[in-house]
């Protein structure tokens, strides 16, 4: 029989391995709704509230907390318990005065780091296009599209944003307030591969045409390693521009 419409259920056995769910406790788990992050790079908000933060004992309590608007993602109340929460998202609980930054641990699993409220978020530019009117649209890693108004998109002095660069976005206004270029010597956060979750300096970038560029990096111990450019998230010069 043909599939008629989107899948609405997810068995624990079929859930991404990096969710680290007890596979045999129950049959089903929460399937994240389509949103800013892919399923294998995010966690549904309900699982974060119940399993990661331990703010609820069961799914019913977690749903009630979420539906009451007590959880903010990037400064916006999210009342959908299936909302996917992923890399660099800022999760806030105003009643507890707590803020968390979503990162990956050394095994590629979603982890939350307690942080201070900064009012900004770091986003990676994954693509950019020229839209009607000659302005530049930046496509960010979390599904956002930011429009940068320029007089002439063909002029290098105006087209300063490149794919792979990072931008600071204000929360909840969602305006670009900062820019970190992808250059040699910049500090990067690794989001995939066997070095996931590490910080390292960009040493060299090997350009390739048919495949992803190869980036050589050096970690704090002086060890050099290589990974592909999509796994490299620029976060600053010598220190991250946000608390990480």
From Swiss-Prot:
The keyword Electron transport does not apply. HAMAP family: Ribosomal_eS4. One of its GO terms (biological process) is translation. This is Small ribosomal subunit protein eS4. GO terms for molecular function: rRNA binding; structural constituent of ribosome. Keywords: Ribonucleoprotein, Ribosomal protein, RNA-binding, rRNA-binding. The keyword Transport does not apply. Residues 43-106 form the S4 RNA-binding domain. It comes from Methanococcus vannielii (strain ATCC 35089 / DSM 1224 / JCM 13029 / OCM 148 / SB).
